């Protein structure tokens, strides 16, 4: 086994709890940390109304042990303070980046365009949840 294979992947994601809405409050929204290799939820926090996942993720990271793990987050979690918290907790990270970060997305695309033909790209396509998702990854050494 390589060192990477021994490390766990901790997927952090937000979910709205269906059926939890009533006349007194909106549906509950939670952020959970899930270890894919074990099919185990490490922790979960409720996202308070009038806030979002960005404020709940650091709170969740303080509650769970992510040391030496690889934390994955969608584009909502692509925030400096969240990355700082992950590093403080001694974990690595893989983040999604979309156009919701001003010029950051185009700056990253420009940076990686230099490597486009030097390293192979792996692409997957999945159909589900009423959409087709294509993901590409290129590993630089």
Tell where the protein language model's regions lie, with residue ranges:
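Short, surface-exposed basic-aromatic patches at helix termini and helix-loop junctions that form
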Residues: 83-91
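Conserved, well-structured functional cores that handle cations and Mg-NTP chemistry
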Residues: 1-73, 78-81
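An anionic, glycine-rich sequence signature occurring as long contiguous blocks
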Residues: 98-141
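Short hydrophobic alpha-helical runs that function as membrane-insertion/retention elements
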Residues: 92-97
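Phosphate- and divalent-cation-binding pockets in alpha/beta enzyme and binding domains
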Residues: 81-82, 103
